Swiss-Prot record:
SMART domains associated with the record: SEC14 (SM00516)
Compositionally biased spans, kind Polar residues: 41-59
Membrane topology according to the record: Peripheral membrane protein
Record-linked PROSITE patterns: CRAL_TRIO
GO biological process entries: Golgi to plasma membrane protein transport; regulation of exocytosis
One Pfam family of this chain: CRAL_TRIO
Protein family per UniProt: Belongs to the SFH5 family.
Function per UniProt: Non-classical phosphatidylinositol (PtdIns) transfer protein (PITP), which exhibits PtdIns-binding/transfer activity in the absence of detectable PtdCho-binding/transfer activity. Regulates PtdIns(4,5)P2 homeostasis at the plasma membrane. Heme-binding protein that may play a role in organic oxidant-induced stress responses.
Name of the encoding gene: sfh5
Protein's name according to its UniProt entry: Phosphatidylinositol transfer protein sfh5
Domain of life: Eukaryota
Cell location: Cytoplasm; Endoplasmic reticulum membrane; Microsome membrane
Cofactor: heme b
Length: 455
């Protein structure tokens, strides 16, 4: 029997090859109900190789071959379908990760900063100005620009919308006011002489400390200094811009640590020596309010610490009360000192020695060793021309009138001359105004109460 089977098998090989091809085609056509066979995938995996051998030995049994081919054919099919489906999301993840890798670390760690940079083109378009503190605002690869945006973002506690609004307003204000040009201006020595100074001290490592001094006790006449609010603001802004220049933000090479120390900040000293806290002059109040509004909007996060020196000890309760209503980030910057000679103790020894003697250091007084804005003497009394302005207008039509009436012109010209002579006489009649100068402190009082300027 075995011999007969071998003979029949050997003789049947050439005859069965065509049917095997037809069988394969039939299996491929009949393999459409593969799902039914997939339930048995584990069993045919071992029979797969044997099926190829048994096709020649058992030609009379095509269903077994068909079953094995059906099981073998669909088995790789789902693997082929599953194979591309798995790497697809991996590729998508790589595509998503690539832009994140390309971002600088300060943007990757701070999504709010990245969003603010996305809004920067709109801010520049709406404001029509692209300069802030001497820094031309560019893209996120420009370090000085990054530091400017970080300051506005920190001032608004990470709120992108609020930071965008404040940055827009600050740029609009700079466009209208042109503070960089105010630095080059000249101001009345009579009104502002001795009231504001700027110092830059270096420590042992060469690190600079920028200090602005506001000597409110030096005001001689409240009406003269604060009467013209816009003029006072221009002088105050010019002094601030000088200090901003010394911060050298436009030369920055490293990005500010959003959660760490900001090296681009200054110290402010407000001296209240001989200043009264009891009365508030209306002109002082108006100038103070305008100053706070401007500085709160246009100079955020430029203040490291603020020292109130020569403050009466009785005013200590005011600072204690203020801390209840202000954030810790703001109140930690306020330092009231009753004796100005103790101010230098708050700084390292190398810096301490550079302070004026009156503030506990070894250097000359501020008017000798510190800088200030350009001042000029008033050759003509400023308020005097304002009074005769109206009579001169009346005189003009009379001068243009026919010369038939020369008599009335003479007395009017004399009246004008008398007004010009009397005007300066009225100023010396106000020696008592020197006392109200003490009330100038009201300016700093409000500044201490208002956290806006301290930001």
């Amino acid at each position: 029997m075995a011999d007969q089977q071998e003979k029949t098998a050997s003789s049947a090989v050439p005859e069965t090859q065509p049917p095997s091809q037809t069988a394969e085609t039939t299996t491929q056509t009949t393999a459409t109900p593969a799902p039914e066979v997939q339930t048995e995938q584990t069993q045919p995996t071992e029979s797969g190789p044997s099926a190829a051998n048994t096709t020649t030995e058992q030609p009379t049994n095509p269903p077994a071959a068909e079953a094995s081919k059906e099981n073998a054919a669909p088995a790789p099919a789902p693997a082929a379908e599953d194979a591309p489906s798995e790497p697809a999301p991996a590729q998508e993840q790589q595509k998503e990760e690539k832009p994140a890798d390309n971002k600088p670390e300060y943007l990757a760690k701070n999504p709010a900063l990245s969003q603010l940079f996305d809004r920067l083109p709109t801010v520049l378009s709406n404001s029509g100005h692209d300069e802030m503190w001497g820094v031309p605002l560019r893209d996120s690869s420009d370090v000085p620009t990054v530091n400017v945006l970080i300051k506005f973002l920190r001032a608004n506690e990470g709120n992108v919308k609020l930071a965008e609004d404040q940055l827009t307003k600050a740029l609009q204000w700079r466009k209208q006011t042109r503070p960089t040009a105010l630095v080059e201006g000249r101001y009345s020595a009579k009104k502002f002489g001795g009231l504001g100074y700027l110092s830059t001290y270096k420590d042992a490592d060469g690190k600079e400390t920028v200090i602005t001094w506001n000597i409110y006790g030096g005001v001689k006449d409240l009406g003269t200094t604060f009467g013209n609010v816009d003029e006072f603001i221009n002088w105050r802004v010019a002094l601030m811009e000088l200090a901003v220049k010394d911060l050298k933000m436009d030369q920055a090479t490293s990005v500010i640590d959003y959660e760490g120390e900001d090296p681009y900040q200054m110290i402010q000293v407000h001296d209240y020596l001989n200043v009264s806290f009891l009365r508030m002059n209306p002109s002082v109040k108006a100038a103070t309010k305008k100053t706070i509004d401007v500085f709160a909007t246009a100079y955020p996060e430029l203040l490291r610490e603020k020292f109130f020196v020569n403050v009466p000890s009785i005013m200590g309760w005011m600072f204690a009360a203020i801390k209840v209503f202000l954030s810790k980030n703001t109140t930690r910057k306020f330092h009231p000192i009753s004796n100005g000679a103790n101010l230098a103790r708050e700084f390292p020894p190398a810096v301490k020695e550079q302070f004026p003697k009156v503030y506990g250091g070894s250097a000359p007084d501020l008017h000798e060793g510190a800088r200030t804005v350009a001042l000029e003497e008033d050759n003509e009394p400023a308020p005097a021309p304002a009074a005769p302005a109206e009579p001169t207008e009346e005189a003009k039509p009379e001068q243009e009138a026919p010369k038939q009436e020369p008599a009335p012109e003479a007395p009017k010209e004399e009246a004008i001359k008398e007004a010009l002579v009397e005007a300066p006489k009225e100023e010396p009649k106000q020696p008592a105004v020197e006392e109200p100068a003490k009330t100038d402190t009201a300016v700093t009082t409000q500044e201490t109460v208002a956290p806006a300027e301290a930001k």
